From Swiss-Prot:
It is an enzyme of class 2 (transferase). The keyword Iron applies. Residues 13-129 form the MTTase N-terminal domain. Its cofactor is [4Fe-4S] cluster. [4Fe-4S] cluster 1 binds at C22, C58, C92. Binds 2 [4Fe-4S] clusters. One cluster is coordinated with 3 cysteines and an exchangeable S-adenosyl-L-methionine. GO terms for cellular component: cytosol. Pfam families: Radical_SAM (PF04055), TRAM (PF01938), UPF0004 (PF00919). Catalyzes the methylthiolation of N6-(dimethylallyl)adenosine (i(6)A), leading to the formation of 2-methylthio-N6-(dimethylallyl)adenosine (ms(2)i(6)A) at position 37 in tRNAs that read codons beginning with uridine. SMART domains: Elp3. This is tRNA-2-methylthio-N(6)-dimethylallyladenosine synthase. It catalyses: N(6)-dimethylallyladenosine(37) in tRNA + (sulfur carrier)-SH + AH2 + 2 S-adenosyl-L-methionine = 2-methylsulfanyl-N(6)-dimethylallyladenosine(37) in tRNA + (sulfur carrier)-H + 5'-deoxyadenosine + L-methionine + A + S-adenosyl-L-homocysteine + 2 H(+).
Amino acid sequence: MITPLAKTAPAPRYLYVRTFGCQMNEYDSQRALRLLCAVGYRPTSDIADADVIFLNTCSVRDKAEQKVYSFLGRLRRLKAHRPWLKIVVAGCVAQQLGDGLLKRFEHVDLVVGTRGIGSIASLLEEVERSKRRVAHLPAEELQGFTTDKCRTVGTGDVVAQVTIMQGCNNFCTYCIVPHVRGRERSRAPDDILREIDFLASRGAREVLLLGQNVNSYGRGLPDPISFPDLLRRIGKETSIRRVRFTTSHPKDLTEDLIECFAGLPFLCKHLHLPFQSGSDGILKLMHRGYTARQYLEKIARLREVCPEIALSTDVIVGFPAESEEDYLQTLRLIEEVRFDSLFSFRYSDRPLTRAAGFPDKVPMDVKVRRLARLQSIQADITLQKNLAETGTVREVLVEGPSKASNGQMTGRTQQNRIINFQCPVDLTGKIVPVRIVAAYSHSLKGELLSQPGKES
């Protein structure tokens, strides 16, 4: 009698994911991870073990793009030692260069544009089967804005991200986003609500709503809905405890949305509102659609409606034709508003943008000097803001064990400040009262006042 050979399970294939850039890219990377895990891949944190490397890229600034090229260059040696390795490049650099990436990096197997993530599993299968290198840059997301059937993979985080729209119609003269992400496309509200409710059932207590300009959400849908109305529906129809959103454009920040910060208790008291420059002349060249005075009026109204709101922002120094007076106007706006935190960047030409062709470029040494001074001013403001928190009691959503010290938990206030505090038990996912006892440049130290009940 001949005994048939026992069938053995195929060896697992390992997937390494690396993300550059914004939270939208993080969301897309998680989506790709879920889709590939659903067809048998296993995630690994060790790139040397990977059978597939998925690289999600950013081209918003030249520095981010150069990081991508540097990383891809280092992968040549790894591919030489692991010839079966498949290297996938997705995101904004992929959308920007397309086939050019395959020509520049002969070890890259698959290029996936910003609207092709939903096809990642079938594309990778095609590359494996055909032994061909592929660039896939669809004009639109073929799957549309639908919750992935494998959304159960990778859930369980206390804070989850949910894309509500993609693309941008503003075409700021320095920004490549409309060229690589396309025009604004809003996701159906019912689908957003289903995903949020599902995430809440899997342990999420907070969601971050993502879009290049969430304030213009709903335009173009068969049944138009405003962003404030979407927020109200989230509060009524889901069980999520906290909601944040990013990014907002000042010109689209309506009175209705401002009043949501007072009227919706689940909406965190934090807003990221990029101003980019304090000079009206530079704002006009940037095609931002507002003046410095209009921006300040909206800040004043936000603080009138919600005195405890924390504000963060983006700013660019060294935009073409920026004079010393233009720059000083930016500093004056920062000192007047006193942002809780600020992300600042040196201007860099981006392909496809109008500003790349503008004359009167600011020398690099001037941009470096201006950025350093601005960052020093903001660092002092941020520290003073954090020191002012000392002695206050804040509701903190515990996100997990702190990396700062054993025996500590870490979480965030509604104002998006990080707090580390001693705790004898794991309170991940709980909302707890914490008194701030010390403040630092980028975080706070607190003490737990009481442990939560089952409903916290």
